[in-house]
Amino acid sequence: MRPRPCSILSLDVGRRRIGLAGCDALGISVTPLAALRRGRFDADLVVLQAHCCERSVQGLVVGLPLDAAGQPTAQAEHCQRYGLRLAAALDLPLAWVNEHSSTWAAGEQFGLKGDRSGRLDSAAAALLLEQWLAEGPELKPAQQTASRSGAGAGDGGS
C-alpha cells in the first residue's frame, strides 16, 4: 500500500556518513541532499533539525541493512537505534525500508561506485525514499516502531 504523500527526509545511516534525500510534499520529486559527516549525535541533530525545518519535513524514512534472508545485521541494529533516537528528538514519525544492496544499486545506477564524497550515500538514500514512496509502509510514531522493528523493514509491521 502506498503511503500518504508528505515531505520526507530519508537517511542512509553509516558509521562515517549519513546519506540524505528528501521529497516534496506531494511525493513526486526525490532529491539527494548533501551527505552529513557523522559526529556526535547532538551535532548531527542540529544539522538534521535544520534540514527538517527548511524542508517542512513530516516524517523520516530510515534504511535498515538486512541480510539476503531479511534478517537484521549488526549495522541494522545501529541504524535502528539511531533512527529511533532521531525520530524521538525531532518528534517525527518514521518508517523503515530494507536497504539491502541499496548502496550497490545507487553506485550502478548513478555511476558512483567507490565514491567516498558522500554522493553515493545520498544517492542510496534517494533510492530508499523512492522505494518507500512506491511501497510504504505508513509512517508510525517512534514508540510504536521500537517494539516491532525487529520484524523486518518493509513488512508493514515495522
From Swiss-Prot:
Record lineage: Bacteria, Bacillati, Cyanobacteriota, Cyanophyceae, Synechococcales
Name of protein: Putative pre-16S rRNA nuclease
Native source organism of the sequence: Synechococcus sp. (strain CC9605)
NCBIfam families with a match to the protein in the record: RNAse_H_YqgF
Region (Disordered): 138-158
Alphabetic keyword roster: Cytoplasm, Hydrolase, Nuclease, Ribosome biogenesis
Gene3D superfamilies associated with the record: YqgF/RNase H-like domain
Database matches in SUPFAM superfamilies: Ribonuclease H-like
Subcellular location: Cytoplasm
InterPro entries documented for this protein: RNaseH-like_sf (IPR012337), YqgF (IPR005227), YqgF/RNaseH-like_dom (IPR006641), YqgF/RNaseH-like_dom_sf (IPR037027)
Protein family membership: Belongs to the YqgF nuclease family.
CDD domains from the UniProt entry: YqgF (cd16964)
